[in-house]
From Swiss-Prot:
In the N-terminal section; belongs to the DNA 3' phosphatase family. Catalyzes the phosphorylation of DNA at 5'-hydroxyl termini and can dephosphorylate its 3'-phosphate termini. Has a role in the repair of breaks in single-stranded DNA. The lineage of its organism: Eukaryota, Fungi, Dikarya, Ascomycota, Taphrinomycotina. The keyword Cell division does not apply. This is Bifunctional polynucleotide phosphatase/kinase. Residues 1-38 are annotated as: Disordered.
Amino acid sequence: MSSKKRKSPPQESLTSYFEKSSKSSKKYGSQNKDSDSSSTCLQQKIEIQWSITDSLYIAKYGKLKKTKKFIAFDLDGTLIKTKSGRVFSKDAADWTWWHPSVVPKLKALYQDNYSLVIFSNQNGIPRKPSAGHTFQMKIRAIFESLDLPIVLYAAILKDKFRKPLTGMWNSFLKDVNRSIDLSFIKYVGDAAGRPGDHNSTDLKFAENIGIKFETPEQFFLGHSFVPPNFESFHPKNYLVRNSSSHPYHFKKSEHQEIVVLVGFPSSGKSTLAESQIVTQGYERVNQDILKTKSKCIKAAIEALKKEKSVVIDNTNPTIESRKMWIDIAQEFEIPIRCIHLQSSEELARHNNVFRYIHHNQKQLPEIAFNSFKSRFQMPTVEEGFTNVEEVPFKCLKDYEDTWNYWYE
């Protein structure tokens, strides 16, 4: 995704906007009792410095201390919440501090020589033309209410900047422009994989960076937190568990045959087909390329008539979707085998984002995974296959150093 900087609005327009915002900041921020003038650390008016690209908003308020100690936060559900009780704020004024202890805690951190940073996913901004301006107004009110040097990074697209990916963190490191000791850094966020949490993005973000993590309840209120164990899928643990397993090697049949691949989108079917099966003379039939089922059938039959073996590189989730290939094999009186790629849904979704970020491949929509999951029927020899091979996913060695991060 392009991150080319858009032309910034004229300074006069920004100044006019900030003046208007400052007049209304009392309406937005001063009703929060934590922001009384006696605790203000910045006595003069500070203009927010905005840097806006196609997928990243950066807002700087004041100048961060030259310190090795940083505390980073999520925004929504961690530092602030909506006044209305809605999940998403209805306007720039629909916010209040998450808890009365937030501002005193942040001011104490500042006095203790900590620099404050916010990393936030804001993917709602591109959906509405006015959302970007509304977000800037809200940030203006929040920063003026807090009145401490602070910097915000907000990812607005599903690209390298979106948590749990570390693009925002890398941008921050570039801006800080000095070495940072990760042992002095902590990230606080509400998306921690607990029952009731919308996801575990914040916890995974901290794990990707390699820094300590706390929930807002833990950090501000002193509550305990037991991290989830991610038993179903954890990229680093998956690599460790499968480090000693041997990679799958496709064995070419001595006779003409049909091979039917079965598995989630992004489970490795096409990689297997292209790297191991097509290279041994098999004709690949793929509906993403041919577009329709009828064209797939036609291509397979034409290859079989030329006495070539065929590999069906589709998801093939149901007995019915596989039956037509079994019928064709019986018509040609040749064997048909099935290779089931045993990637879990979590692993497949992980691969989907991984190949989008690192290999510039199109990211598949949510419905592709939900559809396969809801329709999937385990392949068996009773359907008519001569055998069914179960093949676990094996990450290519060259990709392990980047694949082992959280992407979802």
